[in-house]
């Protein structure tokens, strides 16, 4: 099961302030065009841009009429509750959808493998999360976030490229080129300190930038993803993602800890780096031993399509017969207003 369309949560804003999908005819209009990013670190920061992006995704991309289709929206496990109220307003008042449902990305990641209890460890473009889920409900007080994610790594990788190849004038590389190169050449080290100290262990290779230039990279390949495990490399005070995953397990009741540790689901495009699963497993097991939980053996689930696991889980959930009574309808919204989302959705 794969999505028909995958695009970044950004839009081009022409001079008359109407977002257009990247690649759409409006992108070619000359003058006064800027890229807007409606979502930052998993939180909506530009509702106008998001409305335009969704409208064009539905009408121009999927070629459907919003007023004819119910919509399931995923949101960040740490997103503020008022964000859901605003989503309801946007869907019912601006896009006039007949019904909607909202679920956090952690639950949908678990649903993608048919599970409703476990620990979701997400590493996407804007934010990372470790979220315990039990019986379909998220444990908000045991949810941890890290603002180092794929976009941060891409910016860091650009800096590494510029430093490694000062003669090639790489400052002007597009974000798309840097991101594509990051996905092709970077990997997670299983022994970062050892690899840094021993140049003989660097897996050196040449890569084409697409403009005819070639770069030869060594330590840059494994230094790029490392801030997910050591955020301090970029000046962030938070612990790395494996530590946050362990802290999430610590926060839940002892009676449920083993059960949730048996299903640690990895999701998001930033978990696709070669070596990511192995490093996460090593560090999570080490955390358990270090803090007196030697019997706790986390079992990681890493499906090949985990970069779109949230979409897969949402598609599976919305297709269930038992789910159809869980939609928030237009009539319900008109009677109770946007505050109803706090009662209807977890």
UniProtKB/Swiss-Prot annotation:
InterPro entries: Actin, ATPase_NBD. Disulfide bonds: none annotated. Pfam families: Actin. Transmembrane segments: none annotated. PANTHER family: ACTIN (PTHR11937). Belongs to the actin family. This is Actin-like protein 10. The lineage of its organism: Eukaryota, Metazoa, Chordata, Craniata, Vertebrata.
């Amino acid at each position: 099961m794969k999505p028909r369309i995958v695009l970044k949560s950004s839009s081009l804003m022409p001079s008359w302030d109407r977002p257009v999908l990247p690649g759409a005819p409006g992108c070619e209009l000359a003058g006064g065009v800027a890229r807007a990013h409606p979502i930052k670190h998993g939180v909506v920061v530009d509702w106008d841009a998001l409305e335009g992006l969704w409208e064009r995704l539905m009408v121009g991309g999927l070629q459907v009429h919003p007023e004819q289709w119910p919509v399931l929206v995923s949101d960040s496990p740490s997103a503020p509750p008022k964000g859901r109220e605003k989503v309801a307003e946007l869907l019912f008042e601006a896009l006039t959808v007949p019904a909607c449902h909202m679920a956090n990305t952690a639950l949908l990641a678990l649903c993608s493998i048919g599970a409703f209890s476990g620990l979701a460890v997400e590493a996407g473009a804007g934010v990372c999360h470790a979220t315990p889920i039990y019986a379909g409900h998220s444990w908000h007080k045991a949810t941890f976030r890290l603002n180092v994610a794929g976009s941060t790594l891409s910016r860091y990788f650009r800096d590494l490229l510029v430093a490694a190849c000062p003669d090639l004038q790489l400052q002007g590389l597009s974000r798309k080129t840097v991101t594509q190169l990051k996905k092709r050449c970077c990997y997670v080290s299983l022994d970062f300190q050892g690899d840094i100290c021993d140049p003989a262990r660097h897996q050196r290779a040449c890569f084409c930038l697409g403009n005819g230039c070639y770069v030869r990279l060594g330590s840059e390949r494994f230094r790029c993803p490392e801030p997910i495990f050591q955020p301090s490399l970029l000046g962030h005070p938070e612990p790395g993602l494996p530590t946050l995953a362990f802290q999430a397990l610590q926060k839940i009741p002892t009676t449920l800890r083993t059960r949730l540790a048996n299903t640690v689901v990895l999701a998001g495009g930033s978990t696709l780096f070669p070596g990511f699963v192995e490093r996460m497993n090593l560090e999570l097991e080490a955390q358990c031993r270090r803090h007196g939980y030697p019997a706790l053996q986390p079992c990681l689930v890493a499906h090949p399509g985990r970069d779109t696991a949230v979409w897969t889980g949402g598609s599976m959930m919305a297709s269930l017969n038992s789910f159809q009574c869980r939609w928030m309808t237009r009539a319900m919204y008109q009677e109770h207003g946007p505050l109803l989302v706090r009662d209807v959705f977890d």
